Amino acid sequence: MKCIGLLGGMSWESTVSYYQALNRGVRERLGGLHSARVLLSSVDFAGIERLQHSGDWPATARLLAAEARAIQAGGADFLLIGTNTMHKVAPEIEAAIDIPLLHIADATAHRLQADGVTRVGLLGTRFTMEQDFYKGRLQERFGLEVLVPDDAARERVHRIIYDELCLGDIRESSQAEYLAIMADLAQAGAQAVILGCTEIALLVGACQAAVPLYDTTAIHAEAAVTLALA
């Protein structure tokens, strides 16, 4: 079994979900007392969040690249970045290491393609919904048409992630708000919705939405288990 490197802590709420999914995935496939070989580096998210919102992405890239090198030095065979937003600096992280990076958008796109989805809604932080590092990859590499909410809805989605979900604060009112936004995306033609922030599944993962939901944390972890056991 290969050792999975996990760059986490962004936020730790979703890193818990990753750790559970990786271990459950290995146990389901191998049975018994088997569990995943995981090397985790969990960063202090407060500093990362400040750099995100100040726009200092080069500093986040340097910080996370150093963590990735430490994971590699510890013996990991490949790397997961356990957050959608910080895939903005995935190229810099990938350039800093010699082990493969399993990209969260690629794993999600492969699942969408396998299911025949061509037009998909995207929820996440404003960075993920508005910037090209994620949407552009889905469009250019996989030919997916990506829909995002309007500006006011994007702001609500973003605020709920940082002010509530990253703190483990799960509110029914926010769940209803997300479901309404997803219904609007479905009305606009989305065949499915990507939960493009690893915390969102904590809020709506068990809900019956207007369209199928693609939980990027679960998909990323499943792809990692497949690679680890290949």
What are these regions (language model features)?
Residues 1-230:
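Non-catalytic structural scaffold of enzyme domains
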